[in-house]
Structure formats: C-alpha cells, structure tokens
C-alpha cells in the first residue's frame, strides 16, 4: 500500500494456499495525505504543511459517525480497478468535510477524524475477497503514527508493517519500480496489466529513444 496524496493498493497473490491463483489487482482507495496536509495547513494558518509523525491527530477524538457516513459516498462503492486524485479529494472536498465536522471543531479532532477516515477506507477495501495476509506500507503516510495505529486497529488479522521492514527504502521504491519497467521495455516484455489499469489488454509500456 502506498500512502501518498492518495492511498492505493496492489494485491499480489501468495506463493501457495487457496488464493495462489488470485489475479494481480491494483487501485486507488481514496484520500490520504491529500486531505490531511491541506487540513494541517488550514488549521495551522499556513505555519505547518503536514502533521509530522501524526502527533496532532494523536491528540484528537475521532468522529466515527461521520466516517461511516463518508464511506457511503459513490467513489468508495465502485469496484476496482479505479483511479482518483486531487480533482475529487482536494480543497473543495476538504471544505465540505470541515463543514460537516462543524465550525467549532478542534483541529486535533478534525485531523484525528480525517486520519481515521483514510484507515477506514483502506480497511473497507481489504475486507473484500481475496483475504489479505500481509500489508507492506510505503509513502509519507507510513511515518504517520496516528494513521498506522488506525490501520492496525481497523485491519485486524493482517500483518501490517512498513516497506523498509523487508529491506526496501520507502523513499526509493518508485525509482526501483521505474528502473524495472524500463528494463522490461528493453526486453520487450508487457508490463501493463488490465486488472490494474482497466485497459482492454496488456502491453509494453514506454518508448525507447535511441541517442
């Protein structure tokens, strides 16, 4: 799972067991840091750009009623593959959620609720088959203790740990992935997977430019 501006998942089938033949899947779950960072900037009057370590959110109280209402929104009812971004979960979306939280909401409570919202979105997606055994987390959100705590509480039965626990620096994984994609292109191997991209068929990605 990548917890960047948007939370997205890639499901890899296990090497053995009842789900070993499950297809590779990937999709965008919903907002992560896109809403959190905007909220921090708003609550701090522009002094802060993100909630370092999730310390601010850890001090707040979660509005679970609002979270359950938000989970009923159309995007979260769509089946994968699906993709989203700040055009849906940006400033206008934050404004609406802050109105629903109330003008007198404490910043810590607002951040705690938005943080738990991201975890609830991910947990809802992971509750659907196939069963997930292990979840490796990358992106800036993996350093947010409030978010990681909420993920552990809501994704019970799933072994959850940061990507660097298996020796891959979360800050380097995208560079490694693009290097692998480039290598596959040089070998003329297909890298696009319709189960992830939603395309009609797989194919080679990128263009080779010779000097």
Q: Model-predicted segments: where are they?
A:
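Conserved ATP-utilizing enzyme core subdomain
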Residues: 25-119, 197-211
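Short beta-strand scaffold segments in enzyme catalytic cores
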Residues: 7-12
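A short acidic Gly-Thr/Ser loop motif
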Residues: 2-6, 30-32, 137-145
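Glycine-rich phosphate-binding/hydrolytic loop that grips phosphoryl groups
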Residues: 112, 116, 164-211
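Phosphate/pyrophosphate-binding loops at sites that engage ATP/ADP/AMP, CoA/4′-phosphopantetheine
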Residues: 123-133
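Glycine-rich phosphate-binding loops at beta-strand->alpha-helix junctions
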Residues: 132-154
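Generic structural signal for residues in well-ordered beta-strands
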Residues: 159-160
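A short glycine/serine-rich beta->alpha loop
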Residues: 23-26, 105-106, 163-170
């Amino acid at each position: 799972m990548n917890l960047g501006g948007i939370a997205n998942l890639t499901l890899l089938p296990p090497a053995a067991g009842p789900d070993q033949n499950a297809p590779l899947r990937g999709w965008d779950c919903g907002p992560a840091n896109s809403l959190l960072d905007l909220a921090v900037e708003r609550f701090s009057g522009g002094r802060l750009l993100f909630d370092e370590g999730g310390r601010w959110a850890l001090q707040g109280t979660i509005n679970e009623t609002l979270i359950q209402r938000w989970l009923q929104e159309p995007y979260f009812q769509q089946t994968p593959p699906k993709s989203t971004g700040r055009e849906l979960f940006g400033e206008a979306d934050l404004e609406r959620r802050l109105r629903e939280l109330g003008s007198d909401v404490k910043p810590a409570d607002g951040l705690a609720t938005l943080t738990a919202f991201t975890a609830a979105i991910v947990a809802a997606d992971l509750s659907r088959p196939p069963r997930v055994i292990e979840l490796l987390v990358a992106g800036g959100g993996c350093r947010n203790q409030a978010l990681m705590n909420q993920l552990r509480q809501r994704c019970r039965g799933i072994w959850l740990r940061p990507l660097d626990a298996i020796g891959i620096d979360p800050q380097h994984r995208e560079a490694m992935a693009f290097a692998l994609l480039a290598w596959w292109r040089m070998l003329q191997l297909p890298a696009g997977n319709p189960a992830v991209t939603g395309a009609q068929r797989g194919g080679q990605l990128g263009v080779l430019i010779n000097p």
